Regions:
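A short beta-strand structural signal in non-transmembrane regions
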Residues: 272-278
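Sec/Tat signal peptide C-region and signal peptidase I cleavage site
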Residues: 20-24
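An extracytoplasmic/periplasmic, membrane-proximal ligand-sensing/linker region
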Residues: 32-36, 225-226, 252, 260, ...
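Bacterial N-terminal signal peptides
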Residues: 8-18
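N-terminal secretory signal peptides that target proteins for export/translocation
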Residues: 1-4
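Structural beta->alpha junctions
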Residues: 43-44, 278-282
Length: 347
């Protein structure tokens, strides 16, 4: 009888150990020899892709076990496709990470269509830029007649701005139109940033909204050869010194209500190029990943490589990202509803 009880106990222990392999593994054991997938939520060629591949190259050195990281591009709906995939379909063990568009988390907070995740439950590792040394700009081709942002409203025909559906450039272009009252027409439906650049080259559109770092990483020759002209700054409370002659969107907001909408729209810039792991990741795996991201962002080799690829760095950690998301979620309901109305009116 005692032998049968002992044998049953041994069998039960074997079953339980088979059900809980992760609990018996250290972080180093989990990642050693493993291939981690980093999903980039946009197509190849743009700043998101450039920065994502930079992180995939350097981050393994700082993760215990030094896993290999491969890149997978998963564009769609301004980053929502990748976010929904990570939250609902990807392995939840830390073997899949995602670089999201900065606007995706706020899309979840404001209850945008097709959102199937709670951004506050993602495991935020950090972001590469808080926009301290950056500006998001409204650009036009140099052949366009507008020399200043005020000129846009003096023209008989709207200035056509190309945009990726659901992306930051769509959100900022609509903010310029509906909140600042600029005479622009937002041409959506482009699948990627490179497609918008091509549309500008072909004169299908007159311009777009895009960050200065993106311009310098993707098409520095357009700035250096004066092929494009900046007219307006987004993402900043004050003017970036490089563009001291250009007004900020907040300066042009005609009413306190409009300024509140602009400030809400600009909050995601504080968490640009963010990286996330799945929700409910165990703390013993979360902390090493978050620490690895920050160590990487301070590493001399990483910084030098980022400079070479023209990726502007002003990193934030996961806690700082969560603070921005909570700030966004705490905005007055009326502001969020007004912002949603601006976007929904264009659908």
């Amino acid at each position: 009888m005692a032998w049968r009880i002992a044998r049953s106990a041994i069998a039960a222990c074997a079953v339980l150990s088979g059900l809980m392999p992760a609990a018996a593994q250290s972080v180093e054991e989990f990642y050693a020899g493993r291939t981690v997938t980093l999903i980039i939520s946009f197509g190849a060629g743009g700043l998101n892709d450039i920065a994502g591949r930079l992180v995939a190259q350097h981050l393994p050195r700082f993760i215990p076990g030094r896993p290999r990281i491969i890149v997978q591009n998963m564009p769609g709906a301004g980053g929502l496709v990748a976010a929904n995939h990570l939250y609902n379909a990807a392995p939840q063990d830390g073997s899949v990470l995602v670089q999201l568009d900065r606007s995706v988390a706020q899309s979840g907070i404001r209850g945008a269509a097709n959102v199937k995740f709670d951004p506050l439950k993602f495991t935020w590792l950090g972001s590469l830029s808080n926009y301290d040394n950056e500006a998001y700009l409204l650009w036009v081709n140099v052949s366009h007649p507008a020399r200043t942002v005020a000129d846009i409203n003096r023209l008989a025909t709207p200035t056509r701005l190309g945009a990726v559906s659901g992306g930051t450039n769509m959100l900022m272009s609509l903010t310029a139109k509906e909140t600042l009252g600029l005479n622009v027409k937002v041409i959506r439906g482009y699948v990627s940033g490179p497609a918008v650049w091509l549309a500008m080259d072909r004169a299908e559109v007159d311009g777009q909204t895009i960050g200065f770092t993106s311009v310098m990483a993707e098409h520095p020759e357009k700035w250096e050869n004066k092929e494009i002209r900046p007219l307006l700054q987004f993402g900043r409370a004050t003017r970036l010194s490089l563009f001291s002659e250009l007004p900020t969107a907040r300066e042009l907001a005609p009413t306190p209500e409009a300024r509140a909408l602009v400030e809400f729209a600009e909050l995601p810039f504080l968490t640009s190029l963010p990286y996330v792991a799945p929700p409910n990741l165990p703390p013993d795996r979360t902390r090493p990943l978050q620490a690895a991201f920050i160590k990487m962002s301070r590493d001399e080799a990483f910084i030098a490589d980022a400079r070479k690829r023209r990726v502007e760095l002003s990193p934030s950690d996961g806690d700082q990202i969560m603070a921005v998301l909570r700030r966004s979620a705490a905005m007055p309901k009326k502001v969020i509803e007004q912002f949603n109305a601006i976007l929904e009116a264009q659908n």
